[in-house]
Amino acid sequence: MNRTLVILCGGDSSRMGTKKALLPFEDKTMVEYIYDKFRPFFDKIYLSVNERGDLTHLNLDAQEIPDISRNAGPFGAILSCLTMISGDRAFFMSVDTPFMDPRTAVLLYEQSKDYDITTFNFNEACSDTICGVYNKNCIGTLFKGMFFKKVSNSFLQEKCRTNLIETSEIDSISTISMEQQFYKVNDRSSYYYAVFSILKHNFIC
């Protein structure tokens, strides 16, 4: 299998008011929900955290990687993790997208071998979504982008060898729509909606 997953669990969670990773979700926390769902599809799982030890009490078989800088955002977390993972690349996803189907991650992973970045050709509404396979070849570009304070999805995709997969391919491997898979739990109202959707079995994968 030889696949690596990084779940981005850091950030200040200012809109939520508490750590998203530890929000109750079904009978576990949100990060545990994602971990359990993706574990059968990945050999190695890392947790990107603000500080080492943030999620140790969950006793997951996953190595924590603290951010290089607390204020560097998701791209700082990606950079931190790429410098620490054992393999040459990893699939990155945010902890606030718990409805993503693991088969979607596998779809990208299988098409990432000869590229620095493999992600979806998102529409404008999802243009800031962090979801894709990033290779260690991105490290230099990430450093430059952060130094000059202009790092973004568009910046990275322009500077790196990027493979953009059409989102329509999701339909061939998953019964969960793209809109559902990339639904973001980023504030209280979206969290409550997600919890009730689980109870009603609206989002299941």
Where are these regions (language model features)?
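Glycine-rich phosphate/pyrophosphate-binding loop and the adjoining helix
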Residues: 170-204
